[in-house]
Amino acid sequence: MQIRNTFSSLKGEITRFISVSLMIYIITRASISNAYPIFAQQGFENPREATGRIVCANCHLANKPVDIEVPQAVLPDTVFEAVVRIPYDMQLKQVLANGKKGALNVGAVLILPEGFELAPPDRISPEMKEKIGKLSFQTYRPTKKNILVIGPVPGQKYSEITFPILSPNPATNKDAYFLKYPIYVGGNRGRGQIYPDGNKSNNTVYNATSAGIVSKIIRKEKGGYEITITDASNGREVVDIIPPGPELRVSEGQSIKLDQPLTSNPNVGGFGQADAEIVLQDPLRVQGLLFFLASVVLAQIFLVLKKKQFEKVQLSEMNF
């Protein structure tokens, strides 16, 4: 009987441990993952809105620069590089989900024209593979091969990301044409300020939800604060919860207004978007242009030779 009770107790402890571990994993995973472009896949069918705004800006509120470099023109069924640069000060440290400071990660979403897609590994040259490094790109949706996402990846190593792109061939793809196409890119450095569910992360400023007097500040054991604000007119108390990370900017006894910042803004990152244009060039048009240029050069040469010949004839007649 004692052995059976011991076994039942041990079984219960193991079950509770697994349940708690699973809950911690889910909460931690959600708080970390929702801050990068790759996770916009979860809530949006298309990352680019009708207004031209990329949805990553919903969570990354600070505006930062991003740059894209692509060839001016490419031939059909050709692999080329799309280089995305996400610049930032490498000395900066961001607030992590646990409130500690750490290095910034980066992420990007690349929106290509229909028909353009990620180049297969066997079409990528060794030189391009060296530039890509260990990056692993994903399509935004299985049906949207022209939209690629990457991240989060270490910013100190991958502030410049090289995408290997395969251009379409209108001869085999009836939806592709020899035209000029737009390319859009969005890139972020650091964590977001708002999660997709609308809740704030700990990487943003926290404001007072009520006006009044700061009557009590409790520093929590695992970081963060509980700030009690008392309305002087009716004595009503409101408690604002501050997670670990932001630095407190108010003190007990201080009079504050509604929406007044209670903390500093710890965010050092941000999101930016840019665009470029690329021409899918018809090889026959290129050949025609080369033929035209060659004919012009030959015509100039023959004109010079004819002029020289005419001058010689004139000189001989004068001497005669």
UniProtKB/Swiss-Prot annotation:
It is found in: Plastid, Chloroplast thylakoid membrane. Residues 1-35 form the signal peptide. The chain crosses the membrane at residues 286-306. Its main location: plastid. GO terms for biological process: photosynthesis. GO terms for molecular function: electron transfer activity; heme binding; iron ion binding. Keywords: Chloroplast, Electron transport, Heme, Iron, Membrane, Metal-binding, Photosynthesis, Plastid, Signal, Thylakoid, Transmembrane, Transmembrane helix, Transport. It is a single-pass membrane protein. GO terms for cellular component: chloroplast thylakoid membrane. InterPro entries: Cyt-f_TM, Cyt_f, Cyt_f_lg_dom, Cyt_f_lg_dom_sf, Rudment_hybrid_motif. Its cofactor is heme. Heme binds at residues 36, 56, 59-60. Binds 1 heme group covalently. The 4 large subunits of the cytochrome b6-f complex are cytochrome b6, subunit IV (17 kDa polypeptide, petD), cytochrome f and the Rieske protein, while the 4 small subunits are PetG, PetL, PetM and PetN. The complex functions as a dimer. Belongs to the cytochrome f family. Component of the cytochrome b6-f complex, which mediates electron transfer between photosystem II (PSII) and photosystem I (PSI), cyclic electron flow around PSI, and state transitions. This is Cytochrome f. It comes from Citrus sinensis (Sweet orange).
